[in-house]
Curated annotation (Swiss-Prot):
Belongs to the radical SAM superfamily. Lipoyl synthase family. It is found in: Cytoplasm. SUPFAM superfamilies: Radical SAM enzymes. One of its GO terms (cellular component) is cytoplasm. Binds 2 [4Fe-4S] clusters per subunit. One cluster is coordinated with 3 cysteines and an exchangeable S-adenosyl-L-methionine. This is Lipoyl synthase.
Length: 327
């Protein structure tokens, strides 16, 4: 897998917060007065298992997105013995202003990473693992082969572990990426739409809503038995009707599983929270998602893309192998 550039003096320098978002098309404007966090936004405190897992991760030099993206559920998920691993480094080639992962020119791929990841999964005794990555626009296949190598390595050392991949959009490299990931499939294929298309210039510069929908639709056509999944955040300026429109678009593109959670601002350099959706409204979205035909919907303030992914997948995999009637 060859890189486009080799000796780059800026490679490996990570920008965060306001430094990262300084050059995006629509500037991040802080609110005069921040919205007060409501009482339902609460994370659970970590247990001893959480600290054991952190030790294993440091030993194996692995990054979890749980840590890098400052996820509020980190204590709960680590305590259950589940984790989402971020491969291909912790420097992203995009500058999305909702995300707490650093931006810059990434380092070369680590050829030992698939083996290290597989060893971590085995050491942590995971039943279910989610693998995600930064965007790697510097790679000719967007990093798809590295995903495949990680899947293969885990299958060899932990054959009973279910694998979900949460992929970037492989912009400009979609054909080759889908081919690679069809040859070495995960158990669940996840790619997040993140928000309504009207907010893409503000929240997801460099990405395209229709392209992301097409990625999942095309993968489903190639691999009908692999459940597809996508997620969005609320609180960036969308309306309830916008959320419903996204759900309808997902179903029109054969996406079976959905996650919807509250956006929380990682720092003052990130997009402000424009609304806190109430637990009652999340319940309404959940009901509407099932009415639209999603096989599983994880919808609530503290839900993130990988939150309770093991439970979601168990249901979706039962349905897809048992011939559910959605397609």
């Amino acid at each position: 897998m060859s890189e486009i550039k080799t000796d780059d003096p800026k490679r490996g320098i990570k920008l965060r917060g306001a430094d990262k978002t300084a050059r995006i098309p629509i500037k991040v404007v802080p609110l005069q007065e921040k919205l007060k966090k409501p009482e339902w936004i609460r994370a659970k405190l970590p247990s001893r298992k959480f600290f054991e897992i952190k030790d294993i991760l440091r030993e194996q030099k692995m990054h979890t997105v749980c840590e890098e993206a400052s996820c509020p559920n980190i204590g709960e998920c680590f305590s259950k013995g589940t984790a989402t691993f971020m491969i291909m480094g912790d420097i992203c080639t995009r500058r999305c202003p909702f995300c707490d992962v650093g931006h810059g020119r990434p380092n070369m791929l680590d050829p030992d990473e698939p083996r290290n990841l597989a060893e971590s999964v085995k050491a942590m005794n995971l039943r279910y693992v989610v693998i995600t990555s930064v965007d790697r626009d510097d790679l000719r296949d967007g990093g798809a082969q590295h995903f495949a190598d990680c899947i293969k390595a885990i299958r060899e050392t932990s054959p009973n572990t279910k694998i979900e991949i949460l992929v970037p959009d492989f912009r400009g490299r979609l054909d080759i990426a889908l081919k690679i990931l069809a040859e070495t499939p995960p158990d669940v294929m996840n790619h997040n739409l993140e928000t309504h298309p009207s907010l893409y210039r503000k929240a997801r510069p460099g990405a395209n809503y229709q392209h992301s929908l097409d990625l999942l639709k095309r993968y489903k056509e190639m691999m009908p038995h692999i459940p597809t999944k996508s997620g969005i955040m609320v609180g960036l300026g969308e309306t309830d009707e916008d959320v419903r429109e996204i759900m309808r678009d997902m179903r029109a593109h054969n996406i079976e599983m959905i996650t919807i959670g509250q956006y929380l601002q990682p720092s003052d350099g990130h997009l402000p929270v424009l609304r806190y959706v109430t637990p009652e409204q999340f319940k309404i979205f959940e009901k509407e998602a099932y009415e639209l035909g999603f096989s599983n919907a994880a919808i609530g303030a503290m839900v993130r893309s990988s939150y309770h992914a093991d439970e979601q997948a168990a249901e979706a995999l039962r349905e897809s192998h048992g011939g559910c009637g959605h397609h």
